[in-house]
């Protein structure tokens, strides 16, 4: 019986020492704390009217060129479908239920401003924030065009 009690006390002590050691483990040291300016640049909300968007413009034609040049096609497929990343073109763009489901693309995006904001904040993957507002406007126009939301001459 004494050896069981000794074993239990030893185990309890080791557990407490182990937990306190883990609690004081140094941080991993990955990344850095963002500056106030960096936080302020991302701390925006984009509503459906687009009032909060920066000035800029883009065309469907420019968007198609940028879609290929910036590497969008390498993940999402040459025509916005069939890549390793989510499809950006509806398989049935004429389906009226696309709007009813709250989407203008196969992604969950109820407004064109949502598409703009997502691209601006999150694309290209691992190079987020590298697109200019005009590039984002152009790529957004291209995606809306390939989904039959806007005509090709949209600016």
Please provide the spans of the model-predicted regions.
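Electrostatic cytochrome c docking/interface patches
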Residues: 29-68, 124-128
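Bacterial N-terminal signal peptides
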Residues: 8-18
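Gly/Gly-Pro-rich "capping" loops immediately C-terminal to redox-active cysteine motifs
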Residues: 64, 77, 81-124
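C-terminal capping alpha-helices of c-type cytochrome domains
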Residues: 38, 117, 129-153
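Sec/Tat signal peptide C-region and signal peptidase I cleavage site
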Residues: 19-24
